[in-house]
């Protein structure tokens, strides 16, 4: 419910004739302003580039005890009310950070404190670093540190009045009933059956009133009667939602092994060395799939907790399965808080409060878990550090690895990066030895624990299959592999990185591919709902493809609008036709995992099955550990190889290597069958031969020649508008300003032995139109170590703003589409 404010007075009433008066009432004197006892830097919760810097406000005497760094406050700004966040407090105006010799007489006072402190002074400093590093507003960066649901906001209503909106998500208090010491000796009358039932139930411990009422069809009157007698006591306790996630998965145990492998021991020793040195150093754990990286994390966390500090573990959202969470909770119990998108808003708030209160000392979560209010942070772990999902897609477009490295430096704790396919950037920094003031060390873990070995990889050349007359989506080797799985009652995993039934429809007469009316992207066909769906904006259209009699091409009217390519739904249908009925076929993609706990339930179904095939998109490639899986099949490995993105090969290699690692993790040997039309591609060869260098040597040569990361920093400036000309003109203006700036500074770069930053473009984006907005971008290549953000920010300020045109900056960009 919004709380109405009277900040600027009520509207003047219409004049009415004054009633006769005997004498004029004396005018009420204006109250004297409160004395200002301190000053605060306040960042307004208005995310515009022009208002990014803090503003100085006075702290009146009445608010002096409440005002803290991290508090949300209500202030006047111009002719409006605004919420803001205190990021600094000083007794004198001259001592305030960012003060530009302001006149104390002109400083306005803070009107009210809207919330307690929600972040620390160190968090405010990290947010300021992020704001500068990623050319984002400071308020956007501070919001990352706020609790789920946010903080109070000031909004303008339809009537023009300003009001405070409080977060809708609130804590829940449960009422618990328990016996008093006297209650254990109390004997109820023989006729008091319900009292006896209640006392017998409470002998085992406290019970919620809600559960008692359900169990005994309302116990309220009995509880009140015994409470008056002093037999029971009722108290309110905070409910911690999000802690009850249970799983039947057999591999969710975090029980420590009897012994560690040599690789695990080396990794743990290096992490311990970095912890004791306390310089914020980085350890890259480069371990093959199934090498036991999670056990290294668990053992390192045990040592950190024993030292009285806390730990943060980041896992890609796609890998944050019940298996992963179960391992941490089985080892550390209720001290683990979990954050992921499948939690409700209330569950996220309770997990955040568990961390804030100190009840949780270990956080496991996706990218945003990095900003949880852990006290005395002693270790940061980023699992699957190569994952592109660690790069935020909206402003502030930070990379979790870079922010974590900055946090590790400030908190003087180690940062551990783990992956079977480390990113080119992390490997390059380990080769250099130092980066950003920290030491970067790589530790290899080449072996799997026990007797498990890496799977055998076979390549199914689809060119030969086609030449021999096969038109099936499954090659002969893959069919034979699935038959062996069924015969031995084992399990298989099939990867196909396209959801839906068919990637697109195409007219066989004119070649038209239906595209979204609002975006320049082809529509995906979904057989279950008979719809074409846009996976960019979510729009959908009902359609009946050929051979339905109602099938019609939107361009030429032909009825030969046919399904082209493969989707997971189509492969699922083919598997049902090919395999016996007693083989469970389980599909996991964005469509089948929409519901709450759907992801966990599908994995539990796969785990419990006697013989099963798990078919899915990239979400099945990581974070899964099923010893019964002996076969992994890749239906089409070529889809991601030739995308117009210099990281396409790296992403394809990561995906194939990761999914291949799902096979042979138990006592039984594993087999991987990769179907491809490009068997000689370095990505395919590297996976097949278990030799990363086949791909990385080729890939790094290509990047070095073309000047791409890790040899330069790559920034993407994106402009969009419903008016294509306005967007094109605006990005052209930005490009000219950048080129002019660096042309003038070229002698300075050359004297320093550094390359001059380059501007490529502007040009239309690969997806030229999305949600009815035309998109243009330019790329900036700058030397590694050069702080290009300051130059970009200065040019954006000089370019000004254009009504209806939006701009975003992606420093160290991952997505160039």
What do the PLM-derived regions correspond to, one by one?
Residues 1-419, 426, 432-452, 487, ...:
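Accessory, non-ATPase domains that flank or precede helicase/AAA+ motor cores in DNA-metabolism machines
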Residues 39, 68-69, 583, 606, ...:
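A short, contiguous, amphipathic alpha-helix enriched in charged residues
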Residues 728-760:
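Short amphipathic alpha-helix segments
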Residues 45, 200, 704-709, 765-771:
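Short, flexible, solvent-exposed loop/turn segments with mixed acidic/basic and small polar residues
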Residues 750-754, 758-771, 808-817:
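Short proline/glycine- and acidic-rich turn/helix-capping motifs at secondary-structure junctions
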Residues 332, 579-581, 741-752, 800-802:
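Short helix-capping segments at alpha-helix termini
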Residues 251, 255-261, 265, 269, ...:
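Inter-lobe coupling/hinge segments of SF2-like helicase ATPases
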Residues 693-694, 700-701, 738-739, 744, ...:
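Surface-exposed amphipathic alpha-helical segments in non-transmembrane regions
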């Amino acid at each position: 419910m919004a709380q109405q404010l009277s900040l600027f007075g009520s509207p003047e009433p219409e004049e009415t004739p004054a009633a006769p008066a005997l004498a004029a009432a004396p005018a009420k004197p204006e109250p004297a302003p409160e004395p200002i006892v301190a000053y605060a830097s306040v960042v307004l919760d208005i995310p515009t580039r022009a208002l990014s810097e803090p503003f100085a406000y006075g702290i009146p005497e009445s608010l002096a005890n409440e005002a803290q760094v991290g508090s949300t406050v209500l202030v006047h700004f111009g002719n409006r009310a605004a919420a803001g966040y205190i990021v600094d407090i000083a007794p004198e105006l001259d001592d305030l950070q960012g003060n530009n010799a302001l006149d104390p007489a002109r400083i306005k006072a803070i009107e009210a404190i809207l919330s307690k402190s929600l972040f620390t002074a160190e968090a405010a400093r990290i947010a300021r670093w992020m704001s500068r590093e990623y050319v984002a507003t400071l308020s956007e960066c501070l919001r990352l540190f706020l609790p789920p649901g946010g903080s109070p906001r000031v909004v303008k209503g339809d009537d023009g009045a300003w009001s405070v909106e409080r977060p809708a998500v609130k804590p829940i208090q449960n009422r618990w009933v328990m016996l008093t010491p006297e209650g254990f000796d109390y004997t109820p009358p023989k006729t008091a059956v319900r009292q006896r039932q209640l006392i017998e139930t409470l002998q085992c411990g406290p019970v919620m009133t809600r559960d008692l009422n359900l169990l005994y069809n309302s116990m309220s009157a009995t509880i009140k009667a015994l409470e008056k007698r002093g037999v029971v006591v009722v108290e309110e306790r905070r409910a911690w939602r999000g802690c009850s996630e249970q799983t039947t998965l057999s591999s969710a145990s975090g029980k420590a092994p009897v012994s560690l492998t040599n690789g695990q021991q080396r990794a743990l020793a290096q992490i311990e060395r970095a912890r004791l040195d306390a310089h914020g150093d980085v350890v890259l754990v480069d371990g093959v799939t199934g090498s036991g990286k999670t056990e290294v994390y668990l053992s390192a966390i045990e040592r950190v907790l024993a030292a009285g500090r806390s730990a943060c573990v980041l896992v890609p959202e796609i890998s944050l399965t019940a298996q992963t969470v179960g391992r941490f909770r089985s080892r550390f119990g209720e001290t683990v808080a979990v954050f992921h998108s499948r939690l409700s808003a209330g569950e996220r708030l309770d997990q955040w409060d568990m961390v804030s209160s100190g009840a949780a000392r270990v956080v496991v979560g996706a990218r945003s878990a990095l900003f949880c209010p852990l006290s005395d942070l002693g270790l940061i772990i980023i699992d699957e550090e190569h994952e592109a999902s660690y790069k935020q897609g909206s402003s502030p477009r930070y990379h979790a690895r870079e922010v974590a490295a900055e946090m590790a430096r400030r908190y003087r704790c180690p940062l551990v990066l783990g992956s079977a396919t480390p990113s080119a950037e992390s490997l390059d920094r380990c080769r250099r030895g130092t980066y950003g003031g920290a030491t970067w060390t790589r530790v290899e873990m080449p072996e799997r624990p026990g007797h498990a070995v890496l799977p055998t990889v076979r390549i199914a050349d689809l060119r030969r299959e086609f030449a021999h007359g096969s038109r099936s989506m499954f090659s002969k080797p893959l069919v034979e592999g699935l038959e062996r799985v069924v015969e031995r009652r084992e399990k298989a995993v099939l990867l196909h990185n396209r959801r839906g039934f068919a990637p697109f429809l195409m007219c066989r007469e004119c070649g038209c591919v239906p595209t979204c009316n609002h975006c320049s992207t082809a529509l995906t066909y979904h057989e279950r709902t008979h719809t074409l769906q846009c996976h960019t904006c979510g729009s959908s259209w009902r359609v009946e493809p050929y051979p339905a009699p109602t099938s019609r091409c939107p361009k030429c009217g032909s009825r030969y609008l046919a399904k082209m390519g493969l989707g997971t739904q189509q492969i699922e249908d083919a598997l049902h036709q090919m395999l016996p009925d007693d083989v469970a076929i389980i599909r996991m993609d964005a469509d089948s995992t929409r519901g709450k706990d759907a992801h966990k339930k599908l994995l539990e179904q796969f785990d419990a099955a006697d013989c099963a095939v798990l078919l899915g998109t990239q979400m099945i490639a990581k974070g899964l550990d099923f010893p019964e899986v002996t076969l992994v099949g890749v239906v089409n490995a070529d889809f991601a190889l030739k995308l117009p993105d210099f990281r396409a090969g790296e992403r394809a290699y990561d995906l194939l290597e990761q999914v291949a690692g799902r096979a042979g993790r138990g006592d039984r040997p594993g087999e991987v069958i990769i179907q491809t039309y490009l068997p000689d591609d370095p990505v395919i060869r590297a996976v097949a031969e278990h030799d990363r260098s086949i791909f990385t040597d080729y890939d790094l040569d290509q990047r070095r020649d073309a000047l791409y990361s890790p040899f330069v920093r790559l920034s993407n400036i994106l402009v969009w508008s419903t008016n294509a000309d306005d967007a094109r003109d605006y990005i052209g203006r930005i490009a000219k300003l950048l080129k002019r700036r660096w042309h003038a500074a070229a002698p300075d770069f050359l004297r320093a032995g550094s390359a001059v930053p380059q501007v490529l473009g502007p040009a239309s984006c690969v997806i030229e139109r999305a949600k009815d907005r035309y998109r243009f971008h330019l790329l900036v290549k700058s030397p590694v170590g050069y702080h290009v953000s300051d130059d970009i920010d200065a040019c954006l300020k000089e370019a000004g703003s254009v009504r209806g045109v939006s701009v975003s900056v992606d420093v160290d960009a991952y997505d160039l589409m």
